[in-house]
UniProtKB/Swiss-Prot annotation:
This is Large ribosomal subunit protein uL10. NCBIfam families: PRK00099.1-1 (NF000955). Pfam families: Ribosomal_L10. One of its GO terms (molecular function) is structural constituent of ribosome. Keywords: Ribonucleoprotein, Ribosomal protein, RNA-binding, rRNA-binding. Forms part of the ribosomal stalk, playing a central role in the interaction of the ribosome with GTP-bound translation factors. PANTHER family: 39S RIBOSOMAL PROTEIN L10, MITOCHONDRIAL. It comes from the Bacteria. Coiled coil: none annotated. It comes from Beijerinckia indica subsp. indica (strain ATCC 9039 / DSM 1715 / NCIMB 8712). GO terms for biological process: translation. Belongs to the universal ribosomal protein uL10 family. One of its GO terms (cellular component) is large ribosomal subunit. Part of the ribosomal stalk of the 50S ribosomal subunit. The N-terminus interacts with L11 and the large rRNA to form the base of the stalk. The C-terminus forms an elongated spine to which L12 dimers bind in a sequential fashion forming a multimeric L10(L12)X complex.
Length: 172
C-alpha cells in the first residue's frame, strides 16, 4: 500500500468514525476465510459493516472522532465492526462470538462512551431501533382500538336487542 492509498484509507475510516453510532473491536485470529465471509454476510444482513485495516491507520483515523476511546484496543489482529443502528453490530458480533471461540470481542464505543466487553454484550441484548418502533406503534394503537370497541359496543348491544325482539315477533 503506497502513501496515497494510506491517506485515502485513513480519510475513509475517519469519515466512518464521524458518522457511525457504534463501533465494536474484536480479535479474529484463527478464523477461516469461510468463517470471516459468514461474519461479513451476517453483518451486511443486519445493516452493519466489518472491516480489517492496519491498526496504525485506524489509530490515525480515530484522532478527533467521537469513538477515539477504542484506540487502546487496537493491538494484534483486530477488526472493526460498525453500524448506524446502535444495536446491529454488537448483536451480530456477540452472536458470532458465541459460536466461534477464536472470535474475541475486545470492546467498543457508542458515541463518546467507551464500552468494555460487558458493555458490548449488554448493548447486544437490547432491542433494535425497528423493534422499538414496532412496540411503540403497538402501544399507541392499543388504546385507540379499545376506544373504538367501547364506542361501538352500545350500538352493537342495541342491534342485538332489536334482533331478539324481531326474532320473538317472528316466532309468535
Amino acid at each position: 500500500m503506497d502513501r496515497a492509498e494510506k491517506k485515502e484509507s485513513v480519510a475513509a475510516l475517519a469519515d466512518v468514525f464521524q458518522k457511525t453510532s457504534v463501533v465494536v473491536v474484536a480479535h479474529y485470529s484463527g478464523l477461516t476465510v469461510a468463517q470471516m465471509q459468514n461474519l461479513r454476510k451476517q453483518m451486511r444482513a443486519s445493516g452493519a459493516t466489518v472491516q480489517v485495516a492496519k491498526n496504525r491507520l485506524v489509530k490515525i483515523a480515530l484522532d478527533g472522532t467521537p469513538v477515539s476511546s477504542i484506540s487502546p484496543l487496537l493491538k494484534g489482529p483486530t477488526l472493526i465492526a460498525y453500524s448506524d443502528d446502535p444495536v446491529a453490530a454488537p448483536k451480530v458480533a456477540v452472536g458470532f462470538a458465541k459460536d466461534h471461540d477464536k472470535f474475541v470481542i475486545l470492546g467498543g464505543a457508542m458515541g463518546t462512551t467507551a464500552l468494555n466487553v460487558d458493555g458490548v454484550r449488554s448493548l447486544a441484548t437490547m432491542p433494535s431501533l425497528d423493534e422499538l418502533r414496532g412496540k411503540l406503534v403497538g402501544l399507541i394503537q392499543a388504546p385507540a382500538t379499545k376506544l373504538a370497541q367501547l364506542t361501538t359496543a352500545p350500538a352493537a348491544k342495541l342491534a342485538r336487542v332489536f334482533g331478539a325482539y324481531a326474532a320473538k315477533d317472528d316466532a309468535a
